[in-house]
Structures are given as C-alpha cells and as structure tokens.
C-alpha cells in the first residue's frame, strides 16, 4: 500500500488534468490481485519475478534502507555492522514474526547477516515508521522512497550503507496488464505516463 500512496497517488491529479477524457479508480492493497478474475486493467506489483501470462514494464527498483534521526544516533551511536542493531531500538513492520529478523548482504561481498531486532515501537505503516524515526524512537526499516524526503532535509541519516537490506518487500515495481497487443488508448496513456513519471534508476 505504501507504494501506491506515496508514489502513484501523487501522480493521479496531474495525469487527470492532462487527460480530461480518462477516469482513474485506484485500489490500494497489499494482496495479489487477479487481473482477469477481478476485471482490473492494470496492477503495480513489487517483485523480482513478474508473473508469466501478463505483459509488464518495470518502473523502478524499490530498495529498503535503515535510517535514524541525527539526535538518536548522537545519543545511542551509529551501528557499523548489522550485528550492532541488537544494541539499538529498531522500528519495524510487525505484520509477521519474520519482520523483526532483518537480513543484510554486504555490497560486493558474499557475507550475509540476519539480526533479530527489537524496539519499543512497531507499526505496519511506512510513513508512521518514518515519523517515529524522525522523533528519535529508533532505527527504522523503510522503503527508500518513503525516506527520501526526510534524508534530503537532514531529518534522517542512512546507516549501514555498505550493506543491502534484504526484505520481502524489496524488488522491482512492475506495471502489469493483460497481454493484449492493442491496449485501449486510455490505458496506454496511463501506462506511458507512469513509465515516464517514474523513470528507471
């Protein structure tokens, strides 16, 4: 849901302004939608293995990062290795027991580490985790797109940058639609708009 709220929703108003003959119904959900059974024109799914039987275009990589406020790091110190997270308050998703087991792979190396984190604030909403981190409640696991603005403003600092934070919610954001050679012009306009507004990077 976070991707739809924070990356897709802000693009709806400018798209509708540019395409007055097109309407958009946006359904934000974390479940896998069956486009055929549910008569859905287009889905956006974060995955490294897009389903066969659907056409698709990659939008962008969705990476998760760990970050904290400057005040928290000044008070508690900055972890240099994932194993040091056990000495910190961590803010995590908490929808599944595996959400508190943070996995890391060292960039350019084979080393992989899984750390069982704990913290006083657990919340299943990325914007709330971000705000909790800004308030100094701990080190948060966040999608990069959710943290970007706060990082640019200096409200958050990224930690453990030498490590990739591997989560079940990381991957490539894919636009998926029925494999019809001739997409309706209104759907094609939305697909092209999203692909240009969210360039691969």
Stretches found by the model and what they are:
Residues 30, 46-49, 68-70, 142-145, ...:
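Beta->alpha turn/N-cap motifs
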Residues 114-166, 177:
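Hydrophobic hinge/microswitch elements
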Residues 89-109:
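Secondary-structure junction motif
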Residues 53-93:
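Flexible hinge/capping segments at coil-to-helix
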Residues 161-201:
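A late-sequence structural motif
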Residues 1-55:
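Central regulatory/effector-binding core of bacterial HTH transcription factors
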Residues 21-25, 110-120:
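A local structural motif
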Residues 41-43, 65, 90, 140:
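Short, well-ordered beta-strand core segments
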